[in-house]
Amino acid sequence: MGKAKFERNKPHCNIGTIGHVDHGKTTLTAAITKTLHDRLGTGEAVAFDKIDKAPEERERGITISTSHVEYESKARHYAHVDCPGHADYVKNMITGAAQMDGAILVVAATDGVMAQTKEHILLSRQVGVPYIVVFMNKCDMVDDPELLELVEMEIRELLSEYEFPGDDTPIIQGSALRALEDPNSQWGDKILELFDAVDTWIPDPQRATDKPFLMPIEDVFSITGRGTVATGRVERGVLHVSEEVEIVGVKEETRKVVVTGIEMFRKLLDEAQAGDNIGALLRGVQRTDIERGQVLCKPGTIKCYKKFTAQVYVLTKDEGGRHTPFFNNYRPQFYFRTTDVTGVCNLPEGVEMCMPGDNIEMNIELIHPIAMEQGLGFAIREGGRTVGSGKVATIIG
């Protein structure tokens, strides 16, 4: 039995469920797969206990339990991430490689907004989850319509507080458990309503090839008589021969160069696109002018900075991290894309130390600039071993 071919006949979108523990994230995930399967005939129904017993994954040495399910709405194919534990969520959002295109925030109508509801919205803002749709769960257990209205108002205020459009965000009232029991009921209708909202509120993600060209430089060598070649994997966009690119990072000033040749697997290409491992021949560049850790990019699309705030997860001892806390002015290496840069951590006011297993927002200043933008991931390393993982939240300069 060969593997089924992945049919790319609908746009693809990465989403996940977020929200307070026991508000019904996993039940909703199961209800979505069952309802879409039973009502639209797409995908496969995945049982609650199969999602709940999420396998442990090790991503860059960090242990995270996550469940991945896929399903299809009328308009799109979705890959959906659900995590059983709160710590897993935080780790997944800060360290996970898969960027979410949007999230479904689950809030139990019986409890309203809770501590982790706030934390997940804040994290979404910090790590660059661009869109949130809300599912108010357990509405079958609330008899008072005024109470439902109050919870909805509370959610809208909270979203606005974290700079999401609270007034306009779709909020669907339903019951995941009732929909799971009978997808053809009015509660099943609510799941379809949720997906009409998700399909429209979360726009089609921009494909990597449509974004401006960027390639982190992994290696540099010179070919006598031809010039200097920079090699690496194209992160996004498309590059054509004889286009101008900019070399950004490490040095304060950037410079523009023309790409006179593109090579892949020893063959010459006219163009390279996201995902390709290439060598780019650069006109008039000395071997000493360019180094690993810089990026080639479409001119003017990315700048380099030294100072930024970041959302960071500090590995536990069991994950191979530190055994002891670190303090203000801690100076580790920050590994961005292809290179380590030394930097200084400034902890938030009133925070004296950071323990293994903590997640924390901190200010970081690097000793030399790196091409960066919000949401860029990095590892924190000490002597070559990873002790933390983070994402750029805001750029200071």
UniProtKB/Swiss-Prot annotation:
Keyword NAD: no
Keywords: Cytoplasm, Elongation factor, GTP-binding, Hydrolase, Magnesium, Metal-binding, Nucleotide-binding, Protein biosynthesis
GO function terms (MF aspect): GTP binding; GTPase activity; translation elongation factor activity
Residues at which Mg(2+) binds: T26
Main location (coarse class): cytoplasm
Region annotation G2: where it falls in the sequence: 61-65
UniProt binding sites for GTP: 19-26, 82-86, 137-140
Subcellular location: Cytoplasm
SUPFAM superfamilies in the cross-refs: EF-Tu/eEF-1alpha/eIF2-gamma C-terminal domain, P-loop containing nucleoside triphosphate hydrolases, Translation proteins
Catalysed reactions listed for this entry: GTP + H2O = GDP + phosphate + H(+)
Subunit annotation: Monomer.
Name the UniProt record assigns to this protein: Elongation factor Tu
Species name: Lachnoclostridium phytofermentans (strain ATCC 700394 / DSM 18823 / ISDg) (Clostridium phytofermentans)
